[in-house]
């Protein structure tokens, strides 16, 4: 399973959401949740308080057990949910979580903030230091 962690506190730099209008991050979470629900459990969507990418909000993290993880920013909640879902599906389909770069949606290619390796299945003192 691939998990989308969505920052629900994200807001645009010039944005001052009112009580009547939810923050853009919360709107993105709602859009992604609706889209993922139609996929039958392939993708889980989880709200988080902050992904520390405030200058490039809205932000999501895409991860899966034993797979590479990605942080993607500069997402528009009204436009980019389909691209995030498409990327999450590619991530889900690849055993290592490394979808081919050219197959990723353009917005994801241009706005990937970080790619994080999976945790080793067992850490030894050697593997923690990188020594051989």
Where in the sequence are the language-model features?
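Short flanking/linker segments adjacent to small metal-binding domains or redox-active Cys/His motifs
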Residues: 55-56, 61-67, 88-132
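Immediate flanking context of iron-sulfur cluster ligation sites
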Residues: 1-5, 29, 33-53
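Polybasic, low-complexity association/targeting segments
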Residues: 1-14, 124-132
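Short Fe-S-cluster ligation motifs
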Residues: 40-50, 76-108
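Iron-sulfur (Fe-S) cluster-binding segments and ferredoxin-like electron-carrier domains
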Residues: 12-34, 57-80
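Functionally engaged cysteine thiol sites
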Residues: 7-10, 50, 58
């Amino acid at each position: 399973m691939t998990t989308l962690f969505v920052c629900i506190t994200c807001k645009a730099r010039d944005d001052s959401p009112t009580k009547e209008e939810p923050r853009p991050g919360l709107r993105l979470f709602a859009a992604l949740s609706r889209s993922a629900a139609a996929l039958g459990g392939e993708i889980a969507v989880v709200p988080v308080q902050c992904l520390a990418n405030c200058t490039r909000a809205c932000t999501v993290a895409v991860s899966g057990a034993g797979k590479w993880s990605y942080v993607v920013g500069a997402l528009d909640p009204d436009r980019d949910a389909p691209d995030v879902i498409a990327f999450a599906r590619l991530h889900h389909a690849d055993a290592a979580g490394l979808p081919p770069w050219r197959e990723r949606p353009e917005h994801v290619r241009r706005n990937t903030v970080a790619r994080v390796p999976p945790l080793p299945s067992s850490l030894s003192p050697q593997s923690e230091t990188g020594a051989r």
